[in-house]
Amino acid sequence: MDLEYFKQWVLKEFNIDLSAYKANQLHRRILSLMSRVGVNSVEEYIQLLKKDESQRQKFLDFVTINVSEFFRNPEIFEDLKYKIKEELLIKNRILKVWSAACSIGAEPYSLAIILDSLSPNINHKIIATDIDSTILERAKKGEYTYSEIKNVKKEYLDKYFKIEGDKYIINSRIKNMVSFKKHDLILEPYEKDFDLIVCRNVVIYFNQDVKDEIYKKFSSSLKKGGLLFVGATESIYNYKDYGFEKASTFIYRKV
């Protein structure tokens, strides 16, 4: 399989740099995608992606890792809530928060719920970004299935959602706390002066050089004392190299 040719085509077609991904994992997953649709060569797969919109979206879902749910790993979110209350809200009345690679919006809305529960009626600034325009449109709607909200506490469910049929719809108060925008973690610059950056279960897919660059840029984007919250499989072993200290198992503080 001519993976380099495919990478170049994807970069030109979608402006997505697949060289950032772990090579063996990328190779296996692309072969899996190809086998599912019955094509045997990169050229055939490219032709399919050019003409079949549903397959283009499946490929983009694979690349942008669109798997998410509210309060994923609830006990870790409880730890984050404690840190927000005891550290961030003491120093700043209004917080600036970034949910990076936010997928369907469950993560930034989870953050909005936490902030509203801790400091009601304060207009914290939550920026939620993703590389996938289609998934951002879904996130803006704020409509979810039971499997996506299953970790939401009953008190939050009653207060922040309404149920219509099999849909759970986030209320306008929480929705209005989040601003969604398209952003590429690898290719585009980062905003500054964040109190909290949340990026979970994404960096694990990238090679080490790209990980290093992303963590350095996250550190640069945080205020001193700001927090980086990562996924349950993403411990940063060399966190000191990026200007962090460990605040807890999956939370790092900029020094």
Role assignments for model-derived ranges:
Residues 247-251:
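Short hydrophobic/aromatic beta-strand or adjacent loop that forms the aromatic wall/cage
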Residues 225-232:
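Conserved beta-strand signature within the Rossmann-like core of class I S-adenosyl-L-methionine
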Residues 80, 197, 222:
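Residue-level signal for inorganic ion chemistry
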Residues 92-105, 124-127:
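Conserved class I S-adenosyl-L-methionine
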Residues 104-119:
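Conserved SAM-binding loop of SAM-dependent methyltransferases across substrates and taxa
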Residues 2-95:
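Conserved AdoMet
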Residues 212-224:
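A short glycine-rich, Lys/Arg-flanked "PGG" loop and its adjoining helix->strand segment in the class I
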Residues 124-198, 202-210, 235-237, 253-255:
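Extended basic-aromatic, gly/pro-enriched interface segments that bind polyanionic ligands
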